[in-house]
Regions:
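Conserved, well-structured interaction surfaces
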Residues: 34, 38-47, 51-61, 85-165, ...
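Long, intrinsically disordered, low-complexity segments
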Residues: 19-22, 117-120, 192-194, 215, ...
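Glycine-rich, aromatic-lined ligand/substrate-binding cores of catalytic
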Residues: 55, 286, 290-294, 298-392, ...
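Membrane-proximal, proline-rich intrinsically disordered regions
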Residues: 19-74, 249-250, 525-538
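Short, surface-exposed recognition loops and adjoining beta-strand edges that mediate ligand/DNA contacts
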Residues: 60-82, 174, 204-223, 237-328, ...
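Flexible, polar/acidic helix-loop-strand segments at domain edges
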Residues: 90-102, 351-431
């Protein structure tokens, strides 16, 4: 079933837990008609939530669109930037400020991300209310399973909200009033997410969510297990409620209850990664196949955003945004000549040396560009040649302002794509087993164990020599393996490097406190709810 069922549930748009919690607009469709049996209850109260995993609207979707979660997790790091190219890509300083960590509480894009995340959280609460009020039409098993799946979706969105904003409200009822909404500490949100996922995981289907069929694109048990591994790996960060004091608890002294046993954070991460292995996930022999057109049969991908240009409006913008105009034109569309890998990123891949990582050509367009074996020519008659080492944050005075920087690759080009290559048949990879292996390697090293088997399994797959399993090599390998997948900000924070100087970026005054590791609560939300307090130093 290559479909995420279109929902017909009428849902209010909410602003920072305001209008949705104060008003209950009448549904536009007959309630009895859309909730008259178990199948319709599932479609309209559960499956409807999956419409929000991806998007074609700016700042919405977990990945695929611009000015949203992915950009704040990628273009704020040493991985990539949107450089200013003369009159292009200034956008009021948006991209430069993003890279330099100069955002503030009035950033409209951060507000839109907050609004998007809590829209889905509130809709999840509404769905739980609907399921509860229609139990007479459901079996006990259906009530249990529908409820578990919605709670898992809600936990997923709370995870992204906590990761970005730290202190956020925990709201589990659709009928709560605005004046009842209070802000929770990050550690409380973390515990809530872990408890929710551990509680519902046994009721979730154990199917592979990335494969076509009845569970395609859904939050199944392996998705929950991956997320629990990620939560455990970052437990030192998420349990820290005062992230500007320079102190945090060691993962060896943070405990989880797992399968009836007490385990520290690193042991917990390892356990959940092992569960994924037992659930049948493994590395694909061909790294690139995970990102191919029609990648639904990957044995490695765990959770994806389903894309089908004939069925969905979800989009993948990053190839379109990155390639030079002429490059996009060679595929019959257009492009925006924007996003590039930083110089430090391409150097990490060994670009310009005799030891280039074998993943470089898959992940980037660099040097002379060929399409169907033919060169692409610029308006001046010269061939298009990307210059990875000439990238600067502001290229306005550079002779390479149109061609500087290695461009986004990774996903196979869908030659039948719509909307200038934004509507494609490559599902967007959110979670995959390759990441789980690197998480397991890191957790083992942090726990005083040997993570070389997991780390070097990743390198074996792409024909690269073994390296020692230490934290420096693991962080580098995460860049080599997971570039363009939206994990770099989280990784740099966990390794204590996000607030440091890096390529073309000088730390802000007081940034050594770590205040930029969490984004500001949007000012509009503070104005609407006086019980919300701003994060430190904003």
């Amino acid at each position: 079933m290559k479909t995420i069922i279109k929902y017909i549930l009428a849902a209010p748009l909410m602003l920072c837990f305001s209008s949705c919690l104060e008003e209950h607009p009448k549904d536009q469709l007959d309630q009895e008609a859309i909730y008259n049996n178990a199948d319709n209850i599932y479609k309209n109260a559960v499956a409807s939530l999956y419409n929000y995993i991806g998007s074609n609207q700016e700042s919405e979707g977990l990945q695929g669109t611009c000015r949203g979660i992915y950009d704040y997790n990628t273009l704020t790091t040493d991985e990539a930037m949107n450089p200013i190219r003369g009159g292009d890509w200034y956008d009021g300083g948006l991209w430069e400020n993003m890279y330099q960590h100069k955002w503030n509480a009035n950033d409209i894009n951060l507000y839109n991300v907050w609004k998007y995340l809590f829209k889905v959280i509130v809709l999840s609460n509404q769905s739980l209310s609907i399921i509860d009020s229609h139990q007479t039409l459901l079996s006990a098993e259906q009530t249990r399973d529908f409820t578990a799946e919605v709670r898992a979706v809600r936990a997923l969105f709370y995870y992204y909200a906590m990761d970005m904003f730290g202190r956020v409200p925990i709201v589990t009822s659709y009928d709560v009033k605005l004046e009842q909404v209070t802000q929770s500490e990050r550690s409380e949100v973390f515990k809530f997410i872990v408890d929710e996922l551990q509680d519902v995981a046994p009721q979730l289907a154990d199917e592979h969510s990335n494969k076509e069929g009845n569970y395609y694109g859904r939050v199944t048990r392996p998705v929950a297990n991956f997320l629990l591994a990620k939560l455990a790996l970052n437990a030192e960060i998420y349990t820290d409620d005062n992230w500007t004091d320079g102190k945090r608890q060691d993962g060896k002294s943070i405990y989880f209850k797992v399968n009836g046993e007490k385990k520290n954070a690193w042991e917990t991460c390892i356990w959940y990664c092992e569960q994924l292995r037992q659930e049948g996930y493994e590395l694909e022999s061909d790294y690139a196949s995970n990102f191919a057109v029609h990648n639904e049969n990957s044995k490695e991908n765990i959770f994806t955003i389903p894309l089908d240009k004939n069925l969905y409006l979800n989009e993948y913008h990053y190839l379109f945004r990155s390639r030079h105009y002429k490059h996009g034109g060679a595929y019959g569309g257009s492009s925006e000549n924007g996003t590039c890998a930083t110089v430090s990123t391409v150097k990490a891949f060994g670009y310009g040396t005799d030891n280039v990582d074998n993943r470089f050509k898959i992940n980037f367009y660099a040097d002379t560009v060929l399409v169907d074996g033919k060169k692409i020519y610029l308006d001046n008659g010269k061939p298009l040649v990307y210059m990875p080492l000439e990238l600067k944050l502001n290229l306005s005075d550079s002779p390479y302002k149109q061609t500087a920087g290695a461009r986004v690759g990774k996903y196979e080009v869908d030659r039948t794509a719509y909307s200038d290559g934004r509507q494609v048949d490559n599902d967007i990879v959110l979670f995959r087993y390759g990441d789980a292996l690197l998480m397991e390697a890191e957790a083992k090293v942090r726990n005083g164990e040997d993570g070389s088997i997991e780390l070097n399994a990743i390198r074996d797959r792409v024909g690269m020599p073994h390296v020692e399993a230490n934290l420096d090599n693991i962080l580098k390998e995460r860049l080599l393996e997971l570039v363009w997948e939206g994990w770099r900000r989280q990784d740099l924070i966990r390794f204590g490097k996000y607030t440091k100087a890096y390529d073309q970026r000088t730390p802000l005054e007081k940034e050594s406190t770590g205040f930029t590791t969490v984004f500001p609560i949007p000012q509009r939300c503070l104005d609407l709810n006086k019980k919300l307090k701003q994060n430190p130093s904003y």
